[in-house]
Amino acid sequence: MTSPATRFRRAIVRLTTGCLLTAGLVAAGPAVAESAQPADPALAAARVVPVQLTGPADKRFNLVVMGDGYTAEETAAFRADVDTHLGVLWSIEPFASYRSYINVWAVEVPSPESGVDCDPGLDAPRRDTPLDMGFWGGCNPASVQRLLTVDSAKAAALAGLVPGTSPANRQIVALANSDTYGGAGGSYATASGGNALSSLITPHEIGHSLGGLQDEYDYYARGVAGGAYEGTEPSSAHHTLLTEPQIREQRAKWWRWLGEPSEAGGVIGRHEGGLYSTTGVWRPSRHSIMKTLGYAFDQVEREVMVRAISAKVNLLQDHTPNSAPIGADRTVWVDTLHPLGGELDVAWRLDGRTLRTGNARTVDLRALSLSAGAHTLTATVTDPTPFVRDPAVRGSAALTRTVSWTVDRALTTPGDLAEAAFTGHTPTTAPVGARSVVHADTTHPTRSAPAVRWRLDGRPVANPGNDRDLDLRALRLTPGTHTLTARIPGTEAELRWTVDARPATASYELSTPLRTVNRPGRPVEYVYDGPFTMGLAARDDQPGSVVRQFRVNGDGWYTYYGWPTDADAPFRFSPSGTVIDDLVYGKLGRSRAVPWDDATPDYGTHTIEYRTIDAAGNVGPAESFLVTLVKPRG
């Protein structure tokens, strides 16, 4: 295990090289605190730091990250760990597309002692820490080492210091100051802060805590195959006893996704193992983040997570008051959320008839020439994301909201002197990615709808209909850095963003091969007769964390983390894989996760691709090289 002092030195290096996602974490200013002075010393010493603010806490999903076992001198290590975990989280769908729904808060609470309980073994010292985190299920000999627990009451008390949050709109993630592999996903998610794999533990555990996803492991105790599943049809959305024909015929479980290339690699179908059983139960994909850390959520899990995230917020953030009838001499408006992955749809209907509004957020009733009497106007906000295929999910309150008004021509609307101005908008403090949706909301005078005019590098950008959202994907930006502005005509109001349209680049370094082969029109080929290492480095012209990924033979993209025992070491490929703590890493060819998976070497030529995902969400183009594995002589 790396010493806390070593981790502190590494954290200082990471902080001083400009890797933090947001400046707010470094220079937060005064702590956010409740008016009443907390009686608990830990609460009194806690400091709440806004890391990412996308809107009012009571209208957002709030991720509250707190550390345990970090002394005051190790605050830099906690901040660096938070940065690393968030960088990976934002690279994974659906968090990448719905990042704008989420506020992130860091709760810094100094620990009297460094580290957590029973780390790494049951005979390790018990530490005096604010959250009483511990491995082995809280130092339980009947548990497993990787089960990292937290005192839920103490965690909830710390989260309560974040104003505007409640158990209904927040997710707690507790990071332990440790390099030992571990985490848990009960009511709250836990993860070790500094393990090479720890930033991948966090989304896995949030999958449990927030999405209700289940483990796809085919073991419970490491190194021991789980045996046959003996239960009934699982309630889990991503486990089943049904055959593939039965899934189709009954339109059950993941039938809508069958046959699709899996985002986690391979094809969505029926793959045996899960729920800690080796046989007798099946999952959608050969591997996903709920089975093997490093891969993505597959489509089935991703759909569950979209609903879970969206259920924590209201797509319809605000609207023209509707508690009483309104006049026909005014405008009617709605304010919506703004996913980074694509704008929401707003459908307007008058007395059941669809109005042609071009997805606008405002309707001018004066232009409708309403007849005398009362009319009903409705606005339905829907998330059209392709991540969801189940109509029941699409039609749920998580992804569809409707508001209605009674409109009466006999009523006169009082004058409104509200000035046109910007209200909420995409943060301007960090670059936005070339495939993001940028938004700018405005005030709502009763007899006008302030227009938003967009310019890219000084040139007007047409954006009819919904002028509050601008989807940068439609602009096909040239590589480089651009300036985007939004203005309200007739006012001095202007917003300005830097658009990062140049992805980070990656480079690889391999251990010495037997030989190197260069052929015209083919990637460079390296020949090995045994294990070899691959280091991936990234460079970016913008600040922020860069995630590096690779994949073998077109399988799922896998997040590069160094090596399980050392984040600074290169990844190691070998013919049969390397067993570490009863898990298998780095088998070249068909991957292997546990010792009982097929260890037969895949001799021949393999394609290794690599790419980057930068802090703005830009996904770099994949580059590749070839590796040919030959049998050793003799």
Locate each region found by the language model:
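Surface-exposed, flexible coil segments in extracellular/virion-facing regions
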Residues: 352-365, 458-472, 563
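Active-site recognition of the HExxH zinc-binding catalytic motif
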Residues: 200-216
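Catalytic zinc-binding patch centered on the HExxH motif and its immediate surroundings
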Residues: 115-118, 154-192
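Low-complexity, disordered linker/stalk regions enriched in Pro/Thr/Ser/Gly
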Residues: 320-336, 340, 386-456, 474-634
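Propeptide-to-catalytic entry region of secreted or membrane-anchored zinc metalloproteases
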Residues: 37-158, 193, 387
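Short pre-active-site segment immediately N-terminal to the catalytic Zn-binding motif
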Residues: 77-78, 182-203
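Secretory targeting and sorting signals
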Residues: 2-35
